[in-house]
Amino acid sequence: MAKEDSIEMQGTILETLPNTMFRVELENGHVLTAHISGKMRKNYIRILTGDKVTVEMTPYDLTKGRIIFRAR
């Protein structure tokens, strides 16, 4: 998938799920399931409930996403 095809949105972590999955509420109110990107996993970036994150989604399935950034 080309980078231009992805949709990036801001959201808040609602809950932590097993296997580094998270339930994220986007700014528009939509709730989706997201996992951590490989670079965040490699660098041991911790994500907790309530954190502001940037989520990358594909236009084909808007119920799943990838967390690519955690705001400080």
UniProtKB/Swiss-Prot annotation:
GO terms for molecular function: ribosome binding; rRNA binding; translation initiation factor activity. Keywords: Cytoplasm, Initiation factor, Protein biosynthesis, RNA-binding, rRNA-binding. It is found in: Cytoplasm. One of its GO terms (cellular component) is cytosol. It comes from the Bacteria. One of the essential components for the initiation of protein synthesis. Stabilizes the binding of IF-2 and IF-3 on the 30S subunit to which N-formylmethionyl-tRNA(fMet) subsequently binds. Helps modulate mRNA selection, yielding the 30S pre-initiation complex (PIC). Upon addition of the 50S ribosomal subunit IF-1, IF-2 and IF-3 are released leaving the mature 70S translation initiation complex. Transmembrane segments: none annotated. Residues 1-72 form the S1-like domain. Pfam families: eIF-1a (PF01176). This is Translation initiation factor IF-1. It comes from Actinobacillus succinogenes (strain ATCC 55618 / DSM 22257 / CCUG 43843 / 130Z). Belongs to the IF-1 family. InterPro entries: NA-bd_OB-fold (IPR012340), RNA-binding_domain_S1_IF1 (IPR006196), S1_domain (IPR003029), TIF_IF1 (IPR004368). The keyword Cell inner membrane does not apply. Its main location: cytoplasm. The keyword RNA-binding applies. SUPFAM superfamilies: Nucleic acid-binding proteins. Component of the 30S ribosomal translation pre-initiation complex which assembles on the 30S ribosome in the order IF-2 and IF-3, IF-1 and N-formylmethionyl-tRNA(fMet); mRNA recruitment can occur at any time during PIC assembly.
